[in-house]
C-alpha cells in the first residue's frame, strides 16, 4: 500500500481525514501539501464549500463557470488573486508538507480533482484503507463513493 501511496501525487491533491461518520454526515479535516495546518469541516456541505474555496484560492483546476443570480443576495467572494501566480506556476517554489502519512480516525480519502467543468468536478478519489481508486464525474458521485465506503466500514449495506 505504501508504494501505491508514495506514487499518489498531484499539485492539487486534497486529503480528507474523516474523524466521524453518522447518518451520512462526515466530520473531519481537509489537508493539502502547501499548508501544515488542517481545515476542519462539519458535514458534507461544509466539506464541498471549503474544497471549492481552496480550488478558487489556487485558481486550479480552473472553474468553467461563475456563480450568478437574478436577485440580490450575498455574493460568493472569490479570493483575491491579483498579482498571484496560478498554482501550476508556483507549485515548484512552495514549501511542501507530507500529507500521505496522515490518517483520519475513521477513514482517509485523497482527492485529485482534474477538472471543474459543467458546474461540477471530475477526478479521482483514492481510499487509503481499501487501496482503491475510484473515478468520479460529479461532486454527487464523489460524495456517493465516500458514503458507500464509509457504510461498508460500518457493516451497512452499500
Regions found by a protein language model. Name each.
Residues 38, 42, 48-56, 122-158:
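Mixed-charge, glycine-accented linear interaction segment located at domain edges/termini
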